[in-house]
Amino acid sequence: MMGWKILILNHWKTMTTIDKEELDSLIQSEWSYLESKKSEWSLLEGKQDMEVLEHVLRCILHLDLTPEKPQEFKECVKVQNPDGGWSKESHTDKTSMWITTFVGLKLCRGNLILKDSDIQATVDKTLEYVLSMQEEDGHWSDPEWSHLDTTCSVTCFLTIYQVTQDKTDDERINKARIKGFDFITQWQRDSGLWKDDTFHP
């Protein structure tokens, strides 16, 4: 019986081992597939689901393709809502806090490379919107997500904003971020997990 276990374990190790060349090839293949579906995520191709787009922007960032694809970031500026946020669907004006923080986060990171003044103004406008929407107990809300999940995304955005904008000493942002962290901490269960009745991260 022990022999079979060793054989299976060795087979599993062989199956899960992948070298850098294979991994790079796999990543390139996946990116090529995404590129072939550009009409389904790029604002250059029309109206889009901003949740899908922000995930693709993360891929662009991770693959170091930002200098080659600046317009994918710049197009987000054009669909920002007047309040400083973004909607789930680019062609609507119902701002989603969850989407706003993730799009804002990608623009913060992308603009470290692009250094575009319009993107910078957009990110700054996003910050003002986010700060204005914090509730008294420290949370942020989004009708499609729990307060816990939304507040996690906002505190992440605020942290990235402070680091990328050299604003770690900004007391206004620090106060909001820490208040958000305190809200998150209060939701932790005795088991160590975070859980609420709306969504289970």
Where does each model-flagged region fall?
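Buried hydrophobic core positions in alpha-solenoid tandem helical repeats
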Residues: 30, 34, 76-77, 130, ...
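An alpha-helical repeat/solenoid feature that recognizes helix-turn-helix modules
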Residues: 1-21, 43-71, 88-125, 136-178, ...
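Short, conserved catalytic or adaptor-binding loops enriched in Gly and charged residues
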Residues: 19, 23-26, 35, 78, ...
